[in-house]
């Protein structure tokens, strides 16, 4: 049983310093000239323990971190796209993460996105509060630990930094994470460590690496144990063409051993495929790369954790994010891969939205967020939006308008689908920031629900009262026409009217004001009203107050579901109308209809 290096991913908003941080960590490792140096992998950099000790100095001892790990394995492709692509069953491939935030700008949209993804995958993380060298008045001490450089700053600069750190603490608290500046953390199990750093000057990097080692020691003892002789398990990071090599696969191996000539199984958009490895390639060390034009060198085998380039036939359609397995039992491996894919793709509903994404990991992330929002999903798949997707969304639209949507993350729309969309009522949400897609979808659904509610509200007969103005009778009957004043609420064409004894006297047939026909009239308005079935001097009289005769089922809907949309005056009138109705039927409005 061997302990592998924990896999570390760097996430954060664009321009907040993800790539600069990775470059600096690599540069520090090379410059430290410690025994062993760094090991360059495809898509990753491994920094061995003796190099970390050289960078961190006494911090490992100060924080009681034992030297039980071989080092740290950094994924070179920063950002949450790589984080979600690099997945394995049950969660993210990364064991730990650095959430990098510009201390001067604070949280930005992609910071929020990254935090949501870390929460979703339950990945332990630290916050690197970057660009402390940009704080006004900061005096740079290249490569020094944060505590040392902080102690050499003016008191005003120290206060500025602490204010900015506590702004991050507040923001993380809003998101449900308790956090503190790393040297003030009292419980590393329940608090997120914030490490102020400069990725450019290297200040704070020793503490950042120390905190990562501490997290690994605390959380990852068991999951870092691997059988180095067992068949390799990994994840596809990218499928790409290399000059002179043809199509190649970049993969991260997180368990076992991978050898040249092994048969490996992976997922394409259609099925599981198997192929035999022709070559395993790793980057040449920098000094060798200067002497040779070749970027890669061949190796016979790699042991986890490892980033490797694989040359093999028939891999053009392999999906990024697909599991990679060495084939020992073909049927068993096939079932294992299919089962893992089905977990994401097939858990769909009879009716719901269509979801398309570029990789398995991003599809999994989008589906999980939609599930948390209780949004049903009809189709969840990988690849560009096709005509078939539009047809599926059209079928879902028949069920409910809010299902007539395609959520497309990081994918294109093929021309035939674009044409089909033009001729349909399907709504397309397309982008590369998951949370923004979700926000846009939610906003669209809210608009539809508001529209539905508005139509529903219009269909519900609401409380209103009118007074028949004396000496303004234009016709006695068929229909009775006279001047009225609206006392409460809004009176509409078609509303039934009753008197204060609860007797129905007629229906509002039409209304006019200065010769203009009206469909409704509001409180304070005086209009000419035609009342069907009413007779002035017999069923209605000048000066009478008439009330809208609300049907009992409408009364319950208003009372139980729409009371928030009524004014206090209208609610009081509802009680008055109920009181009038109960003169004839004491139980009126008391029992909800079943």
Curated annotation (Swiss-Prot):
Residues 3-220 form the tr-type G domain. CDD domains: aeIF5B_II, IF2_aeIF5B_IV, IF2_eIF5B. Residues 12-19 are annotated as: G1. Residues 37-41 are annotated as: G2. SUPFAM superfamilies: Initiation factor IF2/eIF5b, domain 3, P-loop containing nucleoside triphosphate hydrolases, Translation proteins. Residues 76-79 are annotated as: G3. GTP binds at residues 12-19, 76-80, 130-133. Residues 130-133 are annotated as: G4. The keyword Protein biosynthesis applies. Gene3D superfamilies: P-loop containing nucleotide triphosphate hydrolases, Translation factors, Translation initiation factor IF- 2, domain 3. Residues 198-200 are annotated as: G5. InterPro entries: EFTu-like_2 (IPR004161), EFTU-type (IPR029459), P-loop_NTPase (IPR027417), Small_GTP-bd (IPR005225), T_Tr_GTP-bd_dom (IPR000795), TF_aIF-2_arc (IPR004544), TIF_IF2 (IPR015760), TIF_IF2_dom3 (IPR023115). GO terms for cellular component: cytoplasm. The keyword Protein biosynthesis applies. One of its GO terms (molecular function) is translation initiation factor activity. Keywords: GTP-binding, Initiation factor, Nucleotide-binding, Protein biosynthesis. Belongs to the TRAFAC class translation factor GTPase superfamily. Classic translation factor GTPase family. IF-2 subfamily. Function in general translation initiation by promoting the binding of the formylmethionine-tRNA to ribosomes. Seems to function along with eIF-2. HAMAP family: IF_2_A. This is Probable translation initiation factor IF-2. It comes from Methanothermobacter thermautotrophicus (strain ATCC 29096 / DSM 1053 / JCM 10044 / NBRC 100330 / Delta H). The lineage of its organism: Archaea, Methanobacteriati, Methanobacteriota, Methanomada group, Methanobacteria.
